[in-house]
Regions:
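ATP-hydrolysis module of ASCE/P-loop NTPase motor domains
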Residues: 123
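A cross-kingdom feature strongest in bacterial/archaeal respiratory oxidoreductases
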Residues: 4-119, 128-137, 143, 147-199
Length: 199
């Protein structure tokens, strides 16, 4: 958002005069804006409230917002509060592209084909967002994966300056005594994480 060259390149590719020069809201700012009534509607996709920095405030925000759309695979705290729940395909059921924080692109194809499924495959997140945009008379111009990938290819890889790689000092690891062990896990994936549903 702060690099004029990047904004100019994307604006030219998209055929618009200019792009905003300010940053958009981060998750905490979105939650706060919804909780205080500054945002009238939210589209929430695949978010587990317990994984957010302030789950209590997130619950307040979802209850306060005027209209809530949820894109989800399974019931959640978000779907319980949503005005509309739209099912979306799981990663294994769709093709797509991941772009990591460094801007590296990784395309993937569907692991499961429609003829391998016992139910009708739900639409992709991108297709659902396109349908919502169409209903709001907003032209995204990304009706399918092929068009979206062509758009990413047209933009090309960023060759300008990048943020410095973060440097963190590793914390000292606990040393177990004889006969002891240290169990370490990632809070977002274990404990009460959604990946444990049904287990």
């Amino acid at each position: 958002a702060t690099d004029p060259r990047a904004r100019e390149e994307v604006a030219a590719a998209w055929g618009v005069a200019e792009l905003p020069s300010r940053y958009g809201r981060d998750t905490g700012q979105i939650v706060e804006a919804a909780a205080t009534g500054e945002l009238g509607a939210l589209v929430v996709a695949g978010v587990e409230l317990a994984d957010l920095p302030d789950p209590r405030r997130a619950r307040e925000a979802l209850s306060a917002v005027g209209f809530l759309v949820s894109l989800e695979l399974r019931p959640s705290e978000v779907t319980e509060r949503a005005d509309v729940v739209l099912p979306v395909a799981a990663v294994a059921e769709k093709a797509g592209t991941f772009i990591n924080w460094e801007g590296r692109v990784r395309m993937f194809e569907a692991a499961l084909k429609p003829d391998q499924m016992t139910r009708r495959v739900a639409p992709t997140d991108g297709r659902v967002l396109q349908m919502l945009a169409d209903a709001m008379d907003v032209h995204l111009g990304l009706p399918d994966l092929r068009t979206t990938r062509a758009e990413l290819d047209r933009l090309g890889a960023w060759d300008g300056a990048r943020a410095n790689e973060p440097v963190e000092v590793a914390a000292s690891l606990p040393r177990p005594a004889a006969g002891e062990a240290v169990l370490a896990g990632h809070r977002l994936l274990l404990d009460q994480g959604r990946l444990q549903d049904g287990d």
